[in-house]
Amino acid sequence: IIHVSRNPKDNCLSIFENLFDYPEGWNSDQKELAEYYLIYKDLMEFWNNIFRDSILNVRYEDVILDTEKKIKELISFCDLNWEDSCLDFHKNNNPIKTVSFNQANKPIYKSSIKKYELYEKELEVLFSKLD
């Protein structure tokens, strides 16, 4: 199991920005989004206690800042062989059916790290619950 976590504020900002079409609407309500995030955080803590040796926890920011090292750790955890092409993921022409399709065909970029700082005033309700 590979669990990638991210700065809670950046993570929630990304969810908020992407307008996922969930009928419950939790992703577009600052208070509810914060509550869901905190539930997720507690749940991951629970799973980490149960499956400690089976979960590799990776911070998104670490992958961005030290890509090769972190991808090598992921590859090793999966008991796969390293190939230099692992760093060329953005050159893959296979279709991508996720909200990140537009990002996955580009090299890694740092502009999403601490992006939340641009919206601290507008998302004060959300961010105050995550502190």
Protein language model annotation of sequence segments:
Residues S5-P8:
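A short beta-strand-to-loop transition that corresponds to the Sensor-1 phosphate-sensing loop
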